[in-house]
Amino acid sequence: MSAYIAPSQIAQRQLEYFNGKHVLVAGEVEDLFPLELVAHCESVEVFTSNYSYYRQIRTSDKVKSHFGSEFDIETQADMVLLYWPKAKAEAEYLLAMLMTKLGINTEIVVVGENRSGIKSIEKMFKEYGPVKKYDSARRCSFYWGTCLNEPKPFNQADWFKSYEITLGEQSLTVKSLPGVFSHGEFDLGSRLLLETLPKLSGKVLDFGCGAGVLGAFMAKANPEIAIEMCDINAYAITSSQATLEANGLSGRVFASDIYSDTAKDYRFIVSNPPFHSGLDTNYNAAETLLGQAPKYMTANGEMIIVANSFLQYPPIIEKAFNNCETLNKTNKFSIYYAKKS
């Protein structure tokens, strides 16, 4: 069994495309294929919005690695290896940013699972130049193309989706970049959680903050709290910062791979935990979030989360806290509460 994800395996079949190139790897890359690629091209850089992957790849001195929502550093890259992201809007964002940064005559290789919608590259790349499929294997596709047209100027501010949401008497302006959970909408789970929350105090962590809806609402409704917001996704970090700023709020927003960069003295942990990784369901982060939560709380710390009702979270919470209460429930979502004892 290969150590590489299927899109990397199809790229591995076509190594001659990378000969003599300075390659910038971007998108939904999850494995260490970029380290192998070093032997087949002039240089490799990795640009990722995934903090967990960044923590892994940055330990190697074979490649330069960058984490963020915008690639705004000097580079000698003349080819992009794009792992097709699950959100089409994120693919459009990455193409606009990277083609503008690297310019005319930049070559591009695009790899991804067919179910991810990679076929969209055929229309999406037309404004930059020709692109064509050259290989299919493992239910994946391999495209190669070249940017022959002058890309339009790229300004990240143009890519924010801005929308208003109202809860009771509170209203909020939300700023969201492509690739962020619930991009451009107020999801029902978060709404139910906010409607159920008690009065908050002390240091509060919004874990998996997305566009900052939970954290900003909590800060607005509880002006005396010290709000902290974390996410694994760089687009979420930038979006949450923009949401706070748009509403005249302040708080600490930072990247964290579950609890890797958090404090250990939260009075409240509030979350709409993620359970998707790429195109697949992945409960690992949520299980660690719930199971390890007491270690990152004050003596009387409390945790309140929303989850799809079919997810088996109560036993995990019960094991960690020795208690778990359902505060609210619909036919789709449940609000779970636990207190450190």
UniProtKB/Swiss-Prot annotation:
GO terms for molecular function: 16S rRNA (guanine(1207)-N(2))-methyltransferase activity; nucleic acid binding. The keyword Metal-binding does not apply. Gene3D superfamilies: Vaccinia Virus protein VP39. GO terms for cellular component: cytoplasm. It is found in: Cytoplasm. Pfam families: MTS (PF05175), MTS_N (PF08468). Disulfide bonds: none annotated. The keyword Cytoplasm applies. Its EC number is 2.1.1.172. It catalyses: guanosine(1207) in 16S rRNA + S-adenosyl-L-methionine = N(2)-methylguanosine(1207) in 16S rRNA + S-adenosyl-L-homocysteine + H(+). InterPro entries: DNA_methylase_N6_adenine_CS (IPR002052), Mtase_sm_N (IPR013675), rRNA_ssu_MeTfrase_C (IPR023543), RsmC/RlmG (IPR046977), SAM-dependent_MTases_sf (IPR029063), Small_mtfrase_dom (IPR007848). Keywords: Cytoplasm, Methyltransferase, rRNA processing, S-adenosyl-L-methionine, Transferase. Monomer. NCBIfam families: PRK09489.1 (NF007023). Belongs to the methyltransferase superfamily. RsmC family. Specifically methylates the guanine in position 1207 of 16S rRNA in the 30S particle. PANTHER family: RIBOSOMAL RNA SMALL SUBUNIT METHYLTRANSFERASE C. This is Ribosomal RNA small subunit methyltransferase C. The lineage of its organism: Bacteria, Pseudomonadati, Pseudomonadota, Gammaproteobacteria, Vibrionales. The gene is rsmC.
